[in-house]
């Protein structure tokens, strides 16, 4: 082998394609090891070769130590004399047990490597297809590594036979596996850059997975230095793509001229690991998904055996070499344009477990864990405040809990439809025969056919499921709905859970019920001789129920006292501190009034002066259209009585509750509520008084729908005397009243603003909590938009034209309410400033009816005929 002496006379060049695909047939390898035969082998071409040389040289000749100055080769084939030899470095190859072998042609002790530059010049030691084959994942032990790698001469006959058979059957392949597709390739692509120097790697480098199909580096980002490019963890001769039937010239037709190599590391237990890992693969311009149909069964079997290792804690998986390569990014650049594996969950791989999962169909989007845990949107409201719409109505069969202020009445009146147990509905009685009222015992004969009566009787206890406390009062029958039939029985100052036997029901009827058999004389009947007025329409009977306090001797004396001054005394409601009766004037029968009676007597002169102050303030405010007028006041038996005008439509809070069940009020009616209440408050402030308890419960509604401010129990002169303390409703009270006891006119402005806010937003005001704090801080983000036109109208656009200067839906209501709810009292407007705004002036000019009367989205029509119709309606009503 004379060529071995000239190893240092040539420079290293890249291997030619023909040199790396030489036909190492049996005849050439079995030829005698003479210099002439070696020279003939050098002149052989690779055009007729269709198989790749065997790369498992390590498994045949045992392990050897790899250094930067002594490259190891899988096998050596003679080079053409005119072709410049080239070499590449490979990483250390380890094998636990060397394979016994006979001395071969390459076993020459004189061919000890001296330097990497000189070894590359040897024509007989040309690395044709260097492929490193890592057998183990651990570092080599000193006992398994030789001191110097010795390059052998040509192998013997036995060795050549095994070498050739391993090439034809596929090196290191199990018997059940098909031959490697790499052995069928006839062309190879040489690297366009010199091989990189091998750098030292740690024990965990075998866990790294370098993706050759998806690389974050473009073709222009190549660096020849191993430390500057992560694509070069190790180098070797490039391997063709994994395909059986694909033509290499076709597969790499789109590869750019500058082909950079990347390394792929796969586990040693792979079926084709001896041929494929680690290899230098050209970086293609597009992602290639090569799936071999012939090796699919081998891959699936090998992958199933290593399934436990695939799910490693490092979130990486060892993929067989003929499987689809990892796919970690999509649509990042032109390099990732192959969509062959985008929707494949079995052949795709990602460093993130859920990144390559297929998208579920649209029908299953609601069955994801997040969708199941997330509560439905109906659970929460969009505003954070409770709406009055579609809320269960309050049961009017029992008295609501006492209010936080003595001004809020409790209604006992409830409708009572006729039934078989009750008499027919009579005509409304009128007092024409006599003006005298008397208490009549049941044993007193009465002409029941001509005299309607008001029957007071003890309510029945038949509906109770528990035995009540013993009582001397017993009733045989009741002709009305029992009071508190579904009562929850809260313990309040005016009600006792065990005082049902003293509950009274007032039955107003057109005829006398059947005689009541009473066992004692404690049952009373208030009979009133009246003449039936046939001109009035008939009305259904109703029942008035109130607690036992009204049936005591005190209530009897107060009722008898009212009967001496008025006629048709009817209890309208009862609160914690007062009771309200509806009475008729004994002279003017058409005049009706409301009488307010305090439940407690004067506790002393100071208490008496405080109560009389309310009377004096209401007297001073007499004569305004939006102030409840005081008619008279007197004292009797230590109780204070006040006679005021009657507002037939009740209070504003009841109207808002009933209307809120259906929908929100239209904006024009909200503006009318603001205007009328502001007009009454302006009169109060101009008289140098402050109300300090302004709320919908204290705003009364007349028969015409006009609003009037009443209940001046918390009112005071302005400026407020020092040391005065008032407690109002926490839902409407101003923040400075609670914090600093500042009783001033801005406190009334805040109460007016929160009242308008409740009417416009149709929400239940919070009495505490975060929402309560946000309202006091001027934050209305939890509330819906107040200025809106989504309330709708039954009138068409042709009959109801929108005015050119309409303020409806322009956001004016939101601005005014937010202005009135300013946290700082000095930042709130005065009542005169509110009434001077353009919106209020526009509403005042267009409104024709009361505040609660619907006049359309934009108020009354500008058509004079429409105004005349409105006036005729008011007259007829």
UniProtKB/Swiss-Prot annotation:
Residues of the Protein kinase domain: 566-843
Task: Give the record's GO biological process terms.
Answer: cell division; mitotic cytokinesis checkpoint signaling; mitotic DNA damage checkpoint signaling; mitotic G2 cell size control checkpoint signaling; negative regulation of G2/M transition of mitotic cell cycle; negative regulation of G2/MI transition of meiotic cell cycle; positive regulation of attachment of mitotic spindle microtubules to kinetochore
Q: Which gene encodes it?
A: wee1
User: Which EC number applies?
Assistant: 2.7.10.2
The answer, when asked if RNA-binding is one of the entry's keywords, is: no
Where is composition skewed (Polar residues) in this entry?
36-73, 85-96, 179-190, 251-277, 319-332
Annotated coiled-coil segments of the chain: none
Q: What is this protein called?
A: Mitosis inhibitor protein kinase wee1
Family according to the record: Belongs to the protein kinase superfamily. Ser/Thr protein kinase family. WEE1 subfamily.
Catalytic residues, chain numbering: 693
Q: Report the catalytic activity.
A: L-tyrosyl-[protein] + ATP = O-phospho-L-tyrosyl-[protein] + ADP + H(+)
């Amino acid at each position: 082998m004379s060529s071995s002496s000239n190893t240092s006379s040539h420079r290293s060049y890249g291997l030619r394609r023909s040199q790396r695909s030489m036909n190492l047939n049996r005849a050439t390898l079995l030829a005698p090891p003479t210099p002439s035969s070696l020279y003939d082998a050098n002149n052989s071409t690779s055009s007729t070769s269709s198989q790749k040389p065997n790369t498992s040289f390590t498994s045949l000749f045992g392990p050897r130590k790899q250094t930067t100055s002594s490259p190891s080769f899988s096998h050596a084939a003679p080079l053409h004399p005119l072709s410049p030899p080239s070499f590449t470095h490979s990483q250390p190859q380890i094998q636990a047990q060397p394979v016994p072998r006979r001395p071969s042609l390459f076993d020459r002790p004189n061919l000890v490597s001296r330097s990497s530059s000189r070894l590359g010049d040897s024509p007989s030691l040309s690395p044709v297809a260097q492929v490193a084959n890592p057998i183990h994942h651990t570092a080599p032990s000193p006992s398994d590594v030789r001191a110097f790698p010795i390059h052998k001469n040509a192998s013997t006959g036995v060795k050549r036979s095994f070498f050739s058979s391993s090439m034809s059957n596929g090196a290191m392949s199990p018997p059940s596996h098909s031959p490697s597709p790499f052995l069928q390739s006839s062309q190879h692509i040489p690297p366009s850059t010199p091989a990189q120097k091998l750098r030292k790697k740690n024990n965990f480098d075998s866990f790294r997975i370098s993706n050759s199909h998806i690389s974050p580096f473009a073709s222009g980002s190549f660096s020849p230095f191993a430390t500057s490019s992560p694509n070069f963890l190790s180098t070797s001769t490039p391997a063709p793509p994994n395909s059986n039937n694909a033509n290499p010239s076709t597969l790499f037709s789109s590869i750019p001229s500058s082909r950079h190599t990347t390394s792929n590391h796969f586990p040693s237990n792979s079926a084709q690991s001896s041929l494929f890992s680690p290899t230098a693969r050209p970086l293609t311009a597009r992602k290639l998904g090569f799936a071999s149909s012939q090796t699919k069964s081998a891959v699936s079997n090998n992958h199933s055996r290593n399934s436990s290792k695939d799910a490693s804690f490092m979130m990486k998986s060892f993929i067989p070499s003929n499987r689809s390569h990892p796919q970690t990014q999509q649509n990042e650049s032109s390099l990732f344009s192959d969509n062959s594996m985008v929707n494949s969950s079995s052949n795709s791989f990602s460093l993130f477990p859920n990144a390559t999962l297929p998208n579920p169909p649209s029908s299953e989007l609601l069955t994801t864990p997040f969708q199941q845990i997330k509560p439905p949107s109906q659970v929460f409201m969009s505003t954070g405040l409770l709406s009055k719409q579609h809320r269960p109505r309050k049961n009017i069969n029992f008295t609501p809990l006492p209010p936080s202020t003595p001004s809020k009445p409790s209604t006992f009146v409830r409708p009572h439809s006729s039934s078989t147990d009750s008499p027919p509905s009579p005509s409304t009685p009128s007092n024409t025969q006599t003006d005298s009222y008397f208490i009549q015992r049941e044993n007193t004969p009465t002409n029941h056919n001509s005299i309607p009566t008001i029957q007071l009787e003890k309510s029945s206890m038949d509906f109770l499921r528990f035995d009540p406390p013993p009582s001397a009062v017993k009733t045989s029958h009741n002709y009305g709905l029992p009071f508190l039939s579904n009562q929850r029985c809260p313990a309040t100052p005016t009600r006792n859970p065990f005082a049902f036997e003293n509950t009274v029901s007032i039955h107003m009827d057109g005829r006398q019920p059947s005689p009541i058999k009473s066992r004692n004389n404690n049952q009373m009947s208030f009979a009133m001789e009246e003449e039936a007025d046939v001109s009035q329409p008939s009305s259904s009977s109703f029942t008035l129920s109130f607690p036992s306090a009204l049936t005591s001797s005190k209530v009897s004396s107060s009722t008898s006292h009212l009967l001496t001054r008025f006629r048709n005394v009817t209890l309208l409601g009862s609160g914690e501190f007062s009771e309200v009766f509806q009475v008729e004037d004994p002279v003017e029968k058409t005049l009706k009034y409301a009488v307010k009676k305090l439940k407690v007597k004067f506790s002393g002169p100071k208490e008496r002066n405080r109560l009389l102050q309310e009377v004096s303030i209401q007297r001073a405010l007499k004569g305004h259209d939006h102030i409840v007028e005081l008619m008279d006041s007197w004292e009797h038996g230590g109780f204070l009585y006040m006679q005021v005008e009657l507002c037939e439509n009740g209070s504003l809070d009841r109207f808002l509750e009933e209307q809120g069940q259906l929908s929100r009020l239209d904006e024009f009616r909200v503006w009318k509520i603001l205007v009328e209440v502001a007009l009454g408050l302006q009169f109060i402030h101009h008289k140098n008084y402050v109300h300090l308890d302004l709320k919908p419960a204290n705003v009364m509604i007349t028969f015409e729908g006009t609003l009037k401010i009443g209940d001046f129990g918390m009112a005071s002169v302005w400026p407020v005397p020092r040391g005065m303390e008032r407690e109002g409703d926490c839902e409407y009270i101003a923040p400075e009243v609670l914090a600093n006891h500042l009783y001033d006119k801005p406190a009334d402005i805040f109460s007016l603003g929160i009242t308008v806010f409740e009417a416009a937003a149709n929400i239940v005001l919070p009495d505490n909590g975060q929402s309560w704090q946000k309202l006091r801080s001027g934050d209305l983000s939890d509330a819906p938009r107040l200025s809106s036109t989504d309330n709708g109208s039954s009138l068409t656009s042709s009959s109801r034209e929108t005015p050119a200067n309409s303020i409806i839906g322009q956001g004016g209501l939101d601005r005014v309410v937010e202005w009135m709810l300013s946290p700082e009292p000095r930042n709130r407007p005065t009542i005169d400033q509110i009434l001077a705004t353009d919106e209020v002036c526009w509403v005042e000019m267009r409104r024709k009816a009361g505040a609660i009367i619907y006049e359309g989205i934009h108020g009354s029509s500008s058509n004079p005929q429409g105004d005349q119709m409105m006036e005729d309606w008011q007259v007829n009503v």
